[in-house]
Structures are given as C-alpha cells and as structure tokens.
Amino acid sequence: MHTFFQQLIGILRWAVELGRINIACEVSILSSFLAAPRMGHIEAILHIYAHLRQHNRSRVVFDSDTVDHGEYIRPDWTDFYPDAREAVPTDAPEPRGKAVQSTCFVDADHASDRVSRRSRSGVLIYLNRSPIVWYSKRQNSVETSTFGSEFVALKAATELVV
C-alpha cells in the first residue's frame, strides 16, 4: 500500500505540473502522508482520480489578451495613494507589439494544519490571461496571526515574480 500510494501521488504531481491547477492544493496536502499513508488517504486519492476522470476535458488555455481590471475588486488605488506616479524615464523608447501584463494572486490559510499549526500558501501568476506559475505549499514557519501567514505567502510570491 505504501509504494502504491507513492506512485499515485507521483502521477498526480506530474498532472499538476502539466497544468491541472485545480488539484494542486489537494495533492500538496496528501503528499505530506507519503511516509505512512492510511486507508483514508488512498480513498482521498481515488476521489481525485474520479474528479479527473469526470473533468477530463479541463485544460490550461493560453490567451494573449490583456486582463480587464474591471473584473477585480479595486482596479484604481488613487483613493488611497493620490500622489503615486509611475516613474518612467524620459528617454525610454516607445513600447512595441502587444501589451504584456502580469497578475499575481496570493492567499494563505492561517494554521490550517491541526497538528503542526502551519499555514498553507497558494500562488497563481498570470502573464496576460495565461497561468505561468502555480503552487500550493505548507509554510516553513508557524505564524501567530493571519497577517503573518499572509505576509509569508506574499514574500514567497514576490520572490517568484522578481
């Protein structure tokens, strides 16, 4: 049962790397039980495989259109930062080609692991409308507040973007 569980997790990790973003968090959580899986963990994996079988037409679509910021909660932050200006050098050349926009979504759940009280970070980075980076990972530190766990997730996302 031990090696069977490891094989199933390996296949699911491969599927996540190929673009099945919708199962990234579940696979990450179940990966923490590789050393000593129980029957409930095998059943959870089989549920994921059933989900993949039912939704076998799901795929990542790479779209070159730019993001419409009207879809988000606040596209304009001038209420909070009225004097903020983007510093563009005066001798900068005119942009060529289509516009490229990167958008990053970050989230963390505070102390979601009931045993170790560690939080889990999730990052999804888009280039225009195409996801290019995604992951779900348990944080290395134990944070005492939601703000702390969100900040750790934001730091990890910033390192990926920069």
Where are the predicted features?
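Divalent metal-binding acidic/histidine catalytic loops
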Residues: M1-V162
